[in-house]
């Protein structure tokens, strides 16, 4: 929780240390290293926790009444890109860089996590394998845009771009499931 909050405050994973985490959590380094073998392992846990929370929110939204398009739009705006969502501060490249520093067991955990997310999503959204791959790429575009810092004058353009991407993704999902 403290690390997640730190990522939010710092607007990304760059530039903070184990000491920053322990200070935010008000624990000693020994306690930190009792729980996590490294900063990267801690960050992995934050991502895993965040994805689980997003998955639960996704299921809740998908169970509600409404069109698939409106539910996808709501999920993307209110959960996937909420103000404190890790997707705003933690890019796919960041996650890949962290995985490179961790033992292979973390890659296996990431694969299981991805499979669980995909299997759950497939119960609500009927897409072919190629369409799922396209959706994942579209979500990567959304995350890429969300994680980038822009000059103050471009913030409005960023917000507009995110909105266009959200509606495009929701349109795509609804259109493909009707085919």
What are these regions (language model features)?
Residues 45, 56-85:
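Hydrophobic alpha-helical connector segments
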Residues 53-54, 82-86, 116-120, 142, ...:
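A short secondary-structure junction motif
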Residues 74-104, 148, 152:
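Amphipathic alpha-helical segments used for helix-helix packing
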Residues 1-7, 21, 46-50, 54, ...:
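Generic hydrophobic, amphipathic alpha-helix propensity
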Residues 7-41, 45:
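Helix-turn-helix
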Residues 52, 85, 99-129, 133-137, ...:
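Amphipathic alpha-helical packing segments from all-alpha helical-bundle domains
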Residues 122-168, 176-179:
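Hydrophobic/aromatic-rich alpha-helical bundle segments in the mid-to-C-terminal region
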Residues 3-11, 53-64, 138-149:
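Solvent-exposed, amphipathic alpha-helical segments
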């Amino acid at each position: 929780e403290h690390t997640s909050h730190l990522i939010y405050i710092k607007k990304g994973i760059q530039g903070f240390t184990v000491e920053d985490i322990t200070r935010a959590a008000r624990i000693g380094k020994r306690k930190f290293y009792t729980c996590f073998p490294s900063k990267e392992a801690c960050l992995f846990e934050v991502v895993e926790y965040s994805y689980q929370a997003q998955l639960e929110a996704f299921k809740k939204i998908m169970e509600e009444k409404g069109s698939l398009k409106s539910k996808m739009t709501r999920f993307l705006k209110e959960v996937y890109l909420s103000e404190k969502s890790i997707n705003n501060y933690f890019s796919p490249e960041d996650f890949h860089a962290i995985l490179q520093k961790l033992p292979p067991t973390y890659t296996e955990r990431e694969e299981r996590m991805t499979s669980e997310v995909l299997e759950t999503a497939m119960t609500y959204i009927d897409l072919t394998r190629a369409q799922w791959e396209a959706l994942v790429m579209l979500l990567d575009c959304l995350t890429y845009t969300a994680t980038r810092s822009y000059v103050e004058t471009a913030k409005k353009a960023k917000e507009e771009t995110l909105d266009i991407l959200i509606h495009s993704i929701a349109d795509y999902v609804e259109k493909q499931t009707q085919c």
